[in-house]
């Protein structure tokens, strides 16, 4: 999960409403009641670093395709229909990972004309709040189909397993609603669900939800510094030079997943990414000299890196954690965070990678390796940059999002089970 280029808003600093009341309050759009509840995500523990790695694992259970991890949508539409559809028989790009064209990275494709480069903010709904549902079920490892498109303006992806219940393909766009076929009507009578992935929280100056969250609400969602041990990160003694070290760029599809990575001390990439990182870990351990494996975290389409963590254990390919925003990541490994701050891409764009067609490191795919020389330069920039913000500022914001997502998933599961029971009775 990383890692494919990487994933789903009221917060615990003020009294939480009952789940039913929250959903009622969030149903601002005229179609909100038609959106099926379909989120799940697991156990929540203490603030960052207080929950042990692997505390909530379900190795024997496949997670449905999701992510989690939720950009806000504005939106425009063709005609009077604000929801876009892609036909069910639309050709798939056949990429190995549904969320990302390559591993966990979003990929440019020839379908950019399907995405909407414009936005409007007239009617807020679940989408704009970042609480969209229809998290995907796992038919196979990645779902029945796989495809990713990039609008050129924001990273987007098609929803998976949307063939169920007669649904056609539905697009998911990071910032904007997508253009629709046939004026918003596809091959289904039911409106498509779209999963939002948030690349930045309310700490960001370009956080796009002003009509729903006013300044006082956003202030209330800011993290109480006393709840997080900030002294554990950004230490002055962290080394800037290494005799041996390995560096990899990690691209997450949502800040929700990075939040949980810091909180639980674990990460998961795609099957290919997990194998690559696991091999690097064992190779580093076999080295006669100390050789740490560092992970440079960035959230897809965020325009920044969010920090640096160290891979401190091998991949457990049989353990699946339940708290990722998208329920599809198989396997996980422990990490230790050293630096947590927002570092803009502009500070790193001059560093180009020969092993990636001399592209800037900011244009890397998930698990892109960075050589020792460039990795050392990046560490120095990370340490020296005096950032005013970091993902820890939005701790309570993401905690509340996780609770809402989890409750919606539980409700959707219950509805699915109740529906299956009803069908069994009718057939008997």
UniProtKB/Swiss-Prot annotation:
| Protein name, per record | YTH domain-containing protein ECT1
Q: What is the lineage of its organism?
A: Eukaryota, Viridiplantae, Streptophyta, Embryophyta, Tracheophyta
Residues binding RNA, per UniProt: 251-253, 257, 267-268, 300, 324, 329, 337
Q: Which organism is it from?
A: Arabidopsis thaliana (Mouse-ear cress)
Q: Which gene name belongs to this protein? A: ECT1
| Alphabetical keyword list | Cytoplasm, Nucleus, RNA-binding
Give the protein's biological function: Specifically recognizes and binds N6-methyladenosine (m6A)-containing RNAs, and regulates mRNA stability. M6A is a modification present at internal sites of mRNAs and some non-coding RNAs and plays a role in mRNA stability and processing.
Q: Which Gene3D superfamilies match?
A: ph1033 like domains
Presence of keyword Oxidoreductase: no
Protein origin, superkingdom = Eukaryota
